[in-house]
Regions:
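Acidic, divalent-metal-binding catalytic cores of TOPRIM
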Residues: 1-348
């Protein structure tokens, strides 16, 4: 006999909602890709709950550690989605592919699948306007040592032509010749001059231009399709100044923003400790204050994963709008009619 969980679908949840009574709040189960995603989606969905509806965020499998978009959108689960059961996933390149693959078609067209628009949750965590506050959270020092927004804007403008080529390679099946890893090897920041970031950008620009030239020679057919794709990406909401939000998330987190914040936070901590040493009246006070400060600060990577400063970003608001429309559709859809009893048998 099949497990109950295998028969669990949107209709089952809807029936359970009806059993709870007419005045009870409707529950919507939201499946996410992995436990790492639970906080992000729970925080987003919780703020959109209404007096009539609430969400419960779950993993797609309770009896295994399998995770990822393929599990969250598997045929077994996909057919079970509906007004009371949804899937919440990273967009990856599927949003930009606009239906070129089966997964992309599901992500872009299913009314019960919601995606991040940006590549992944890590991209939201690296949202440039929020990074200064992340440094404050990690170091308890509000001194602005580095302009994160300006740097990531310049970084994005520099990698933008190559990002379009990366999407092109996946859209037209040429990714074995130009994979996401190949893209990352060009755009990673190995060393950042915090005092002259323009030097780092110029080195990056030379690498990007060289790679673009090689791709143009390798794929001459791209002359007819590259520019239309670029215009399509712009219409989808990408801009040259925000291209970093659409590159692979863990590459951005681990290879660009994480190390960049690490260096800034280390300088901020040293600065705060110098202030403590300068202001301490005696050795005991110095040691007490240093100990208290070091106990109060936090690892920057932990703060980068926990902050919610991206909630004012345009892509995040688009996700919220999608959820609001889903809730409005649910209110407008009448519940299935209750089963009627069979008519009495006719008397002879």
């Amino acid at each position: 006999m099949k497990k109950l969980s295998q028969n669990l679908n949107s209709d089952f949840i809807s029936a359970a909602n009806r059993l709870a009574g007419r005045n009870a709040r409707r529950k919507v189960v939201a499946y996410v890709e992995s436990y790492d995603d639970v906080f992000f989606w729970s925080n987003l969905l919780r703020r959109l709950e209404t007096p009539d509806c609430y969400f419960e965020v779950m993993l797609p499998s309770r009896d295994s550690l399998c995770k990822g978009k393929k599990i969250a959108l598997s045929n077994r689960l996909g057919a079970r989605l509906g007004d009371s059961m949804i899937a919440c996933v990273d967009a990856d390149y599927d949003y930009l592919m606009q239906g070129a693959t089966e997964t992309s078609r599901t992500v872009c067209t299913s009314p019960y699948v919601f995606h991040t628009y940006v590549y992944a949750i890590e991209n939201y965590q690296c949202y440039a306007p929020a990074l200064h506050n992340v440094c404050v959270m990690a170091t308890l020092n509000d001194h602005r040592l580095f302009d994160f927004e300006a740097f990531l804007g310049d970084y994005s403008e520099t990698i933008w032509p190559l990002l379009v080529w990366s999407v092109w390679a996946y859209r037209y099946g040429r990714y074995p010749s130009f994979s996401l890893l190949d893209f990352y090897r060009v755009v990673q920041i190995e060393r950042l001059n915090y005092y002259h970031p323009e030097q780092t950008i110029e080195q990056l620009r030379r690498r990007v231009n060289a790679k673009v030239s090689r791709l143009q020679r390798l794929f001459p057919q791209g002359r007819q399709t590259y520019k239309p794709l670029r215009e399509e990406l712009l219409a989808l909401g990408l801009t040259p100044r925000t291209a970093y939000l659409y590159m692979r998330g863990h590459d951005l987190f681990d290879g660009v923003v994480g190390p960049m914040l690490g260096g800034v936070c280390e300088a901020l901590r040293r600065e705060r400790e110098r202030d403590i040493r300068r202001l301490a009246g005696h050795e005991v006070q110095l040691q007490n204050e240093l100990s208290a400060y070091r106990h109060a600060v936090a690892p920057v990577e932990e703060m980068l994963r926990k902050h919610t400063g991206y909630e004012n970003s345009e892509p995040y608001r688009r996700v919220q709008d999608d959820i609001r429309r889903f809730l409005e559709r649910g209110k407008a859809t009448p519940p299935p009619a209750a089963a009627r009893p069979a008519p009495p048998a006719a008397e002879d």
